[in-house]
């Protein structure tokens, strides 16, 4: 029996009933992407980017949900255990629906990262490869088939996507050590 009250389904219902033609996965990807690019966690900047994706100003209930989502992401990225929970359909949803949401999440992440990245040429080889992987995943969202192999592939990609933002966030939010002051002897 499908889980009707999953966070993904609740957010999807809220967005569609408010007239916003976007998936929760893409919205969550956008938020994580912008956060990992160094945009910070200021609510106003997030709401501006979200409104653009939503194709209009969000109503109060959607605005509250967006702020809550941002607080969740901030907590995930700044806590000691740094664990990212992806906003995707539940495991009992059809594989095609979950795979499409993974692709939408990647598209959102890349958009958020691209809009807010200060200097992508300064990224490490590993970080650049992560972004290339996300672009590839966004393109193959329809390639997973309903089978044990398809399910296994989906889980593998999902686990990768839980780790990828952490690498990018850590890299783009490195604190630069102050230069040592010359001592006067």
Swiss-Prot record:
GO terms for cellular component: cytosol. Gene3D superfamilies: YgfB uncharacterised protein family UPF0149, PF03695. It comes from the Bacteria. SUPFAM superfamilies: YgfB-like. This is UPF0149 protein PFL_5969. Belongs to the UPF0149 family. InterPro entries: YgfB-like, YgfB-like_sf. It comes from Pseudomonas fluorescens (strain ATCC BAA-477 / NRRL B-23932 / Pf-5).
């Amino acid at each position: 029996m499908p889980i009707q009250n999953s966070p993904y389904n609740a957010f999807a219902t809220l967005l569609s009933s408010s007239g916003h033609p976007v998936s929760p996965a893409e919205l969550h990807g956008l938020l994580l992407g912008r956060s990992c690019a160094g945009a910070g966690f200021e609510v106003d900047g997030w709401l501006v980017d979200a409104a653009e994706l939503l194709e209009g100003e969000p109503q109060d209930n959607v605005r509250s949900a967006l702020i809550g989502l941002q607080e969740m992401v901030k907590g995930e990225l700044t806590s000691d255990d740094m664990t990212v929970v992806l906003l995707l359909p539940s495991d009992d949803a059809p594989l095609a629906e979950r795979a499409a949401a993974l692709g939408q999440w990647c598209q959102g992440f890349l958009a958020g990262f691209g809009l807010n990245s200060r200097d992508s040429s300064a990224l490490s080889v590993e970080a650049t490869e992560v972004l290339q992987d996300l672009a590839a995943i966004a393109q193959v969202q329809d390639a997973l088939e309903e089978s044990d192999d398809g399910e296994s592939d989906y889980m593998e990609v999902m686990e990768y996507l839980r780790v990828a933002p952490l690498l990018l966030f850590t890299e783009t939010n490195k604190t630069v050590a102050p230069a040592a002051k010359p001592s006067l002897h």
